[in-house]
Swiss-Prot record:
Name this polypeptide is given: Large ribosomal subunit protein bL25
Family named by the database record: Belongs to the bacterial ribosomal protein bL25 family. CTC subfamily.
Organism per entry: Paracoccus denitrificans (strain Pd 1222)
GO cellular component assignments: cytosolic large ribosomal subunit
PANTHER family in the record: RIBOSOMAL PROTEIN L25/GLN-TRNA SYNTHETASE, ANTI-CODON-BINDING DOMAIN-CONTAINING PROTEIN, RIBOSOMAL PROTEIN L25_GLN-TRNA SYNTHETASE, ANTI-CODON-BINDING DOMAIN-CONTAINING PROTEIN
InterPro entries assigned to the protein according to its UniProt record, in alphabetical order: Rbsml_bL25/Gln-tRNA_synth_N, Ribosomal_bL25/Gln-tRNA_synth, Ribosomal_bL25_b-dom, Ribosomal_bL25_C, Ribosomal_bL25_long, Ribosomal_L25_dom, Ribosomal_uL5_bac-type
Classification via Gene3D superfamilies: Ribosomal protein L25, beta domain, Ribosomal Protein L25, Chain P
GO MF terms, alphabetically ordered: 5S rRNA binding; structural constituent of ribosome
Known role: This is one of the proteins that binds to the 5S RNA in the ribosome where it forms part of the central protuberance.
GO BP: any one term: translation
Keyword annotations from UniProtKB, A to Z: Ribonucleoprotein, Ribosomal protein, RNA-binding, rRNA-binding
Record's subunit section: Part of the 50S ribosomal subunit; part of the 5S rRNA/L5/L18/L25 subcomplex. Contacts the 5S rRNA. Binds to the 5S rRNA independently of L5 and L18.
CDD domains hit by this protein: Ribosomal_L25_TL5_CTC
Length: 208
């Protein structure tokens, strides 16, 4: 299932240059520009509070947005730069790049863990420790997966799940060439305490 692309509502901005940008800010807007895909740059402005909320939510720069401007066709964009006030650290200008449907882009994709009831390690009281609830992947703009799935069937206490253990959708790959950890199954605290006591007893016996 393709991932739902969040909307980002903006307005067309008639003027360009510093004067027009200052006017936009006085009106509670953040001026910006949309470029790329072989088309003319499009000046826009976004409502300040709406943009600030999205920026503070995180992952703004690595999210694919469906840009909606009244009177124009929706376009898929990614943010390529946010200028901020040096004192207040608030956005003063924003740049977006248009994406063609075949464009490859880096995005964070949710990790879903299934068949937890089929994992012996969890049945014994182990805990699923999620190291990466999202994974940054290289995907095609027209076919972004909703999530990637980790099958926990047969997983035991002490098992570790790496990215290479996950079957990724066709055409999708990690952004980094390393077999990083996604999650592991940790022993319950009682079992860890018993193991530690047993190890300590063995150590004392050896020393004696």
């Amino acid at each position: 299932m393709a991932k739902e692309i969040p909307d980002l509502v903006a307005e067309a901005r008639a003027g360009t240059g510093k004067g027009a940008a200052r006017q936009a800010r006085r009106e509670g807007k953040v001026p910006g520009i949309v470029y790329g895909d072989g088309k003319e740059p499009q000046p826009i402005q976004i409502e300040f509070n709406s943009l600030l909320t999205k920026l503070r939510a995180g992952r703004f720069m690595s999210t694919l947005w469906n840009l909606k401007v009244e009177g124009q066709d929706d376009v898929r964009v990614v943010c390529r730069g946010v200028q901020r006030d040096v004192v207040k650290d608030l956005p003063t200008h924003i740049d977006f790049m248009r994406l063609h449907r075949n464009t490859r882009v880096n995005l964070f994709i949710h990790v879903n863990f299934e068949n937890q009831d089929e994992a012996p390690g969890l049945k014994r009281g182990g805990t699923l420790v999620v190291v990466r609830p999202e994974v940054e992947l290289v995907v095609t703009a027209s076919d972004i997966p909703e999530q990637i799935t980790v099958d926990l069937t047969g997983k035991q206490i002490g098992d570790t799940i790496h990215i290479n253990d996950v079957v990724l959708p066709k055409g999708v790959k990690p952004t980094i060439d390393r077999n990083f950890v996604i999650a592991n199954i940790a022993a319950p605290s009682g079992l860890r305490s018993a193991d530690n006591e047993e190890a300590a007893a063995e150590s004392e016996a050896t020393e004696a």
